[in-house]
Structures are given as C-alpha cells and as structure tokens.
C-alpha cells in the first residue's frame, strides 16, 4: 500500500485525447509535497507517513509546528495529512513526492470537503418531489410531509431526511481516472469533477477497489534532488 498525496484544486478545463474527443478534467496541483514525519511499528504501533504541502507563513505557524517542520528540515507547510503505508513503502523524512507518483490511466480515490450550500429544503437537499401545485394545496408545496410514526414508537427516527445544512461535508469519489500528469508544474489531471471549491485541499490515493498498475512507481515518485540528498545522508550516517 503506497502513500497518497495532498493536492490543491485549481479548477476544471478540458483536454483532447488521441481520438480528438474532448475530456472534462479537474486540475490538481502538488506544491512542495514533502514527508515531514514517519510512523513506525516499533514506536507508534503502525506504519504511516505524514506529508506536508504548500507554504505557510512562519508567523501563522504555531511554535510546536515550527519545531516539527524544523526537525524534518522543511519549510512550514500549509496543509498536513497522514497516510497509512505498508512497511516496504515507508518514505524517508524530507523526501519530496512528484506528480509522477500517479500514471495515466490509473484509478484513484479523491477526498475533499464539498461546497457548502447553506440551509436547504428537502427538494434541493434530498430530491423530494414536493406536493401538488394547486387543487386544494396551500403553503405545503415544497414541504416534506409527515415525518413521524404513531403513538408507538412515538418519535421521529434518527436519519430521517429533512431540511437542514447542505454540503460542507467530507466526500470521497472513487475510481476517478488519471488523464495525465505534469511533473515540472506539479499537475495531476483527473477525469470529471472533484469535491471541493477552487483552492481546496484534496487527498488523492490509489483506488482501493482497482489493482495498482504495474508501471506505477514504488514506493513513490521522488524528486531527484530529494532522492540524492537522502542517499548522501545515508552515506554520511554509515
């Protein structure tokens, strides 16, 4: 199991495939995606890597997090997330993951926070049909109707679809196809829509329901400079 990545949603556009057909894509950008911490079985009881992406102002970073990033020898990050990995896919602290971590045609699972819609009625929130427009109906055209039972059980069951706050929830879309990547600019183009607004932070992982392509880099696609720095550090430790 490989690590996922953190990316920022830039928006949507379209590209053309070899057949001349246009493909709607969402553009995700990886900016300075570094490993800032490790989790090991010996110390933590499980194996994972903590990634940081983007740049944050030092004055807006807490003292504890400044020390955390300094220990990893990376600049303060705007977003941090942890990913479970198998022991053979554990990455060294300070390593930088590039957009080539994913390959064209690969399926990924994308997680983000959906756009908030505010307080919404049942017709918008749950696709209720509503009541009759006329013929004896008044006031209740867009109402949800009865919500309860009888004297027994004498309550409204939890989870009943009603009006309320819509959106602003954590949403995962599975099996989205990676159309292409651009390592130099740190771009990942995925087919279709991705939950979240422009500028939102998105979690991208290998699809859990589809096998990983054989040409996908393992344990990850690392920046050459970062990989070289790791090798030098390893030689120095020896």
Swiss-Prot record:
PTM info: Methylated by PrmB.
Keyword Transmembrane: no
Keywords, alphabetical: Methylation, Ribonucleoprotein, Ribosomal protein, RNA-binding, rRNA-binding
N5-methylglutamine: modified positions: 151
GO cellular component, one term: cytosolic large ribosomal subunit
Domain of life: Bacteria
Xref: Pfam families: Ribosomal_L3
PANTHER family per record: 50S RIBOSOMAL PROTEIN L3 (PTHR11229), LARGE RIBOSOMAL SUBUNIT PROTEIN UL3C (PTHR11229:SF16)
Subunit structure: Part of the 50S ribosomal subunit. Forms a cluster with proteins L14 and L19.
NCBIfam families: L3_bact
Family: Belongs to the universal ribosomal protein uL3 family.
Role: One of the primary rRNA binding proteins, it binds directly near the 3'-end of the 23S rRNA, where it nucleates assembly of the 50S subunit.
Protein name (database record): Large ribosomal subunit protein uL3
Organism of derivation: Brucella anthropi (strain ATCC 49188 / DSM 6882 / CCUG 24695 / JCM 21032 / LMG 3331 / NBRC 15819 / NCTC 12168 / Alc 37) (Ochrobactrum anthropi)
